[in-house]
Every structure is written in structure tokens, then in C-alpha cells.
A protein has these predicted regions:
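Transmembrane alpha-helices and adjacent helix-loop boundaries
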Residues: 1-179
């Protein structure tokens, strides 16, 4: 890697760190942009570098989001009551509960989709061409249909994630809505 590449990468990193302060009205859009960059990178690795036309990446992304949110809530509150309450009950995480739950959820969200990807990959990586593409597309569609029927994670309504706690009287902007789909 030459000197100009390093300067470019450092410039992008610095811009990414200061952009929320320079453009405060666009914090959510910038965070969504970062998520989409990660998804595009997974597509590039599989579709470009490896030569596989895969459409199932979103399965692992969604599985990780739902697992992280479910573990974060389920550690301290009954998950079924959280998703069924529809705003009737109020559940409030303390800051320590919020961050402990998020840490545990992130670990589970990293490990379980990795194992699932390994098992699914072992089963379907022998397919080639159109067969592989159709199989991975079917996996994504099937996962959406299955998750739409599981009531404990909100089924068709989605999963409301815990709000970011107020710490020291300061209210932080919450990006937890990016972790689980809400409709």
C-alpha cells in the first residue's frame, strides 16, 4: 500500500469520526450509511472476490440483530411481555442493565450467526451457479417468513429495542433502532 492510500484511508476515518459533529442533523443517515457499507462489503467479498452470487447475507445480519436485541431485553425482562405489551407496560433498563445486556447480546449475535453460516455453508457451498443463487435467495425469503411468524420476537410488527438510557442527565441519541427491524 502506498503513501497516498494511507492518506486517503486516514482522511476517510477522520471524516467518519467528525461527520456527526459537523452534520448533526444527519446522524441517523450517516449511521445507516455505515451499516449499508458493511452490507455492501459482504456482497463484494462473496460476489466479487469469491465469485458466489449469494442473496442470503441478510439472513445472518437479521439473525444477529434479533439475537442481540432479544438477549439484551431477555436478560432483565420477560421477552414475551416486552413484545406483547404494545406500550401498555413500561420497561426501563438502568444504564448498567442496558450495557450489560448489549455486551452479552453482541457476543451472542457474533457467535450464533457464525455457527449458522458455517452449517448452512457446509450444506450449500457444493452448489454452483444459478443453483447456489436460488438456494441463498430462498434462505433469505424463508428466514423472513419464519421470523414473521414467531410471536416472541414481535412477528410481523417487529421488535422494539430498549431506548438508550440517560446517563448523568445527558440524553444520548439512540441508534439501537438499527439493530432490529420495526415496522
Amino acid at each position: 500500500m502506498n503513501k497516498n492510500s494511507w492518506i486517503l484511508y486516514i482522511g476517510i476515518l477522520v471524516f467518519g469520526l467528525v461527520a456527526p459533529f459537523i452534520f448533526p442533523a444527519f446522524k441517523v443517515q450517516l449511521s445507516i450509511l455505515c451499516v449499508l457499507i458493511v452490507l455492501a462489503t459482504t456482497w463484494n467479498i462473496q460476489g466479487g472476490e469469491m465469485g458466489y452470487n449469494t442473496f442470503g447475507n441478510i439472513l445472518f445480519y437479521g439473525l444477529g440483530m434479533y439475537l442481540c436485541a432479544s438477549v439484551q431485553v431477555g436478560m432483565f425482562f420477560p421477552l414475551a411481555e416486552w413484545t406483547e405489551s404494545g406500550g401498555e407496560k413500561t420497561f426501563v433498563h438502568t444504564p448498567s442493565q442496558f450495557f450489560q445486556g448489549m455486551a452479552a447480546g453482541l457476543v451472542v449475535a457474533a457467535v450464533v450467526p457464525t455457527i449458522v453460516a458455517g452449517l448452512i455453508g457446509y450444506a450449500i457451498l457444493g452448489l454452483r451457479g444459478h443453483y447456489f443463487a436460488i438456494c441463498t435467495l430462498g434462505l433469505g425469503v424463508a428466514a423472513g417468513e419464519i421470523s414473521g411468524g414467531i410471536e416472541i420476537i414481535g412477528a410481523g410488527q417487529g421488535f422494539t429495542t430498549p431506548p438508550f438510557p440517560n446517563i448523568g442527565g445527558l440524553e444520548a441519541v439512540s441508534y439501537t433502532h438499527l439493530r432490529a427491524h420495526e415496522t
